């Protein structure tokens, strides 16, 4: 199957959250919003029941991977979980009984891309606490996908989380860790490795010949020459100097409080920030409904909506599919770039 003809693989996400209903809504808007063909990996009967409960006229079709594109025009293609597991969920009430199905859906999506049956992975939101209660050993989606991409017995690749929108793109250097741990984790090596991956993927996947990067400071005023913390002076500044010596266009560390206004944003393509919230607050303020989470550094394309499970509104029919639609469209765009096909899966190399 030609790469342009392959569907996207959309995961189930937490079935008690808004993932299933925004998938249904995205399919309904496929013509109006230019949604590319995708297959959802889950339980067809659960999706049918969800559509019925929400009063949505969405036909659901159980498919094989090769049938998804043809079926997409007339029904939502749902690929059953490989184990045949069934899903039962109450909106807004996460249940550890569904943890196995959630993880299986993610694994199956990666396997579809691995086999060439899908062009990219798009993940619906999960609740990490649901999975950790049953022994899930990864901090989040991003780290689990990196483990799935690793060659057997090898270290997984370093995954880099980029939040992208038309207005702003940001990368948190540290991701799902407590704030008090950041100064110890924020090493010069981590900053340099992260920036190199961002630079490489902006060239290969986004088609930017000379990406412009900027690095936010960790402390107020980027440390004020060491008077408000030494990390900016002793860790971030040397990392920037080393990266510039390699030919990477990066500036910083710069004060975070003046890095995200309109004139500042015009001077760079992606902003790197030391902490999770430094990066995510500005993009969720500017593009809450349109932001997309893109995982860089993997041997396949992965995107996801820039929001969580939203248990508080699940099942009420008010969840917006905008970010999921943006994630689906961006995944297709990135997967169609020829440069994406030059790095095979490690297991196939």
Model features per residue range: what roles?
Residues 163-192:
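Ligand-binding beta-strand-loop-alpha-helix segment within the catalytic cores
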